């Protein structure tokens, strides 16, 4: 393989032409490289939560939660495969991860609008979703918005991924923040003075902000820690568990 990758064999793993035992592979994932262990943990967490909603009631709110979890699975799963170097390569999985990441806030608003029965702004969600899909497809073709990260090998045998922001990245971030502020304003107007409801829905906003913040930290020069995934593991779990309690009420 042209890039650092992992090819699964019957008796072990081949990594840059060297066979590794399964024990070494697990050591690489969980003990030596947070860049692999954290996204795999986030993937398992999202998968578990999705299973929890399989036998729940079917309405717009629950469908929104399932869509959020599905987007989380696409994001975390694609990031895991990208960081493992699985075929067809970094760029391919990077674009799938970007799709999952950007669809999380879209589906968050599907849940939020469904729970608060905000129906007069459904067109906003559809437009937002279509624009997001078009943006990801455009980035996959040109790489001008958020290029695939650079793989950097370190002296201790581990590796990190370094993201390089562009002008398009700044425009994307500004758009996401603008939509988040507008959606929060609509929710605020709908909730009014209902303090209990506001407390229950606050984790949704917190989760979206932390996921966005974690990805922004990864864009800082010299940043080599996987803030993107670490910022989402606990927050997304808390968000969905609280949302499940909200729906149960």
Where does each model-flagged region fall?
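Juxtamembrane membrane-water interface segments that cap and precede transmembrane helices
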Residues: 21-28, 152-167
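Individual alpha-helical transmembrane segments in multi-pass integral membrane proteins
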Residues: 29-46, 57-144, 165-178, 227-236
